[in-house]
Structures are given as C-alpha cells and as structure tokens.
C-alpha cells in the first residue's frame, strides 16, 4: 500500500489537491484541518474514516463512489483509502490566513500556479508573507490502519 500521487493547483485563492490512488488499498494518512472543505471523488471509490485522534483509530467510516463529494469537517482527524485501482479524489478549499481569513485573489500577481513539487508553497509564501503550514494548517498524523 502506498500514498497517492499528488498534483496541486491554485487558481486565485482556490486550492485543489488531486490525489491519484494507483492501486486499491493506497491511502492518504490520517490528518486534520482547521477549516471545513470538500473532497470530490471523480473516479473509483474510497473508504473515508473519521479518526479518534493522532493514533488513527477509526470511530466512523463510510464508502463513497464517484461521482460524488465528501464533506470534510474541520478539526476531525480523517483518512482516505482507495477501494479500487485508479481512484481519483480532489480536495478543494480556499487559501486562508492564520486567522481563517480567505486570501483575496487580488493579492496574487499571477492568477494561477500549478505544481507537483512544492512550487505553490513558495509562491504563496512570497505573495502573502505567510508560511504554507500557517495557511493550510495541514497536520498529518498516524499511519495506515493496518
């Protein structure tokens, strides 16, 4: 079991993170956010689990099939596991400052950045003066559920 292949695109202040789960059983490790967002299931199917915290024990689980969306609640640890080969999911949310203010599209010099290797993190830091971790508050925890 592996982690998904990732592609990131930010247009104005809309951030998308495409996850391509090549094989059934590939997973996105448990993590949490300080904001609500949506994950679009565009191909295949996933097991979405809400975890009890950093140790990664599932307290709720539900299967989702494409096409569809998963509402990802803020401050809830969660994990996504592919149930089919070539499953594709896209996390969608607004870029925010540390105080949860959505970053204005007017603050960007160029309206679009696309990356596979972290260029978006540097671009956001340069344009806003805020670190990527402060904006996304993406905290990864735990491992896979064995």
What are these regions (language model features)?
Residues 1-30, 35:
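A short glycine-rich, His/Asp/Glu-containing loop-to-beta-strand
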Residues 12-20, 79-146:
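Double-stranded beta-helix
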Residues 28-30, 48-49, 72, 77-84, ...:
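Short beta-strand His + acidic residue motifs that chelate non-heme Fe in jelly-roll/DSBH
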Residues 32-48:
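Short, conserved beta-strand element in jelly-roll/cupin
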Residues 42, 50-52, 93:
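Residue-level signal for short segments within beta-strands and strand-turn junctions
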Residues 53-74:
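Short acidic-glycine-tyrosine-enriched beta hairpin
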């Amino acid at each position: 079991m592996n982690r998904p292949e990732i592609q990131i695109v930010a247009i104005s202040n809309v951030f998308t993170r495409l996850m391509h789960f090549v094989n059934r059983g590939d997973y996105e490790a448990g993590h949490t956010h300080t904001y609500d967002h949506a994950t679009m299931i565009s191909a295949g199917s996933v097991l979405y689990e809400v975890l009890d915290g950093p140790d990664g024990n599932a307290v709720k689980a539900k299967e989702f099939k494409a096409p569809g969306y998963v509402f990802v609640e803020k401050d809830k640890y969660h994990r996504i596991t592919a149930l089919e080969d070539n499953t594709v999911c896209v996390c969608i949310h607004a870029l925010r400052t540390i105080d949860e203010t959505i970053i204005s599209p007017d603050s960007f010099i160029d309206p679009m950045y696309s990356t596979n290797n972290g260029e978006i993190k540097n671009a956001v830091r340069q344009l806003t003066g805020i670190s990527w971790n402060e904006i996304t508050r993406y905290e990864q925890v735990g491992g896979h559920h064995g």
